[in-house]
Amino acid sequence: MNLTEIKNAVKAQFPALQAVPTRFRAYQLGNAGASFSYFDGKTFTKIEARLTDTSRPSLIEELRVNKRTRIDTLHITSWDRDHCNHSELLEILQTWMPIRVEYPGYEPSTECGKACKVAIEKYCAKVADRKGVAITPTYIKSLNPSAHYGYRDVVYHPKTLVEKANDNSTVKLFRTGCFNVLSLGDVESEGIAALLKACKTACNEIDILILPHHGADNGFLTGDLLDELKPKLAVCAANNSNQYGHPAPMIRALLNSRGIHVA
């Protein structure tokens, strides 16, 4: 067999171990909030429904670089305005027409959140190939168990819905590319941290950690959790230059003491 034949044989034997062109980007918004994208060579995922005059050119350029004309999946972790802004959501839906919208499974309590949920439901109902997915405990239970070191995303939470809205944020590991990104929304519960520490996939496959609640010091992110998850890079969604007090000094110290770079 020549080299090409050997490579093809290995790919056929081990399809889950193939290299995948992958890009992750954090967007500056010019104000408080979170906005990211993850591209695995096939699927372009926009994380959070935020779009400003500052971030729009960067998103357009990222789509162009990845040769995409639309967003494949819009993933929203929380109904809070800094994660899902109604007017910005409408522009994203109308301009880049996501095929799939993953949105929080808890009921929004604010007028902005309620308007966003209605807009998503109307958008998905208009065209047959658009799919809206509420990330509820029932939805998570319907998913197949994750395979260790496989190219399939893992949704960890919400396992149950609680009174505290922040702890109903969606927790998802994006791992369809050649590196993996853990998105934590605004979670604060020590119980959710314990869930992650008990998960073999989470403890062995995280490359990039999006800091929960914009890097706030709320008791969730501890040294023990970082020691288990072992991220190579932490990303803080707070625009830039430690604006809005994020990440908090204690969180920055925890990361620095473990050699985890903060972006």
Question: What name fits each language-model region?
Answer:
Residues 2-16, 99-167, 233-263:
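Binuclear metal-ion centers of metallo-dependent hydrolases, dominated by the metallo-beta-lactamase
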Residues 27-28, 38, 78, 101, ...:
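Divalent metal-coordination and catalytic microenvironments
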Residues 31-32, 54, 78-84, 107-111, ...:
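Active-site environment of divalent metal-dependent phosphoester hydrolases
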Residues 53-103, 198-216, 230-234:
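Active-site metal-binding motif and surrounding structural segment of the metallo-beta-lactamase
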Residues 55, 59, 85-88, 116-120, ...:
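Stable alpha-helical elements in mature extracytoplasmic
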Residues 81-95, 111-121, 221-224, 247-249:
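Metal-dependent catalytic neighborhoods of phosphoester/phosphodiester hydrolases
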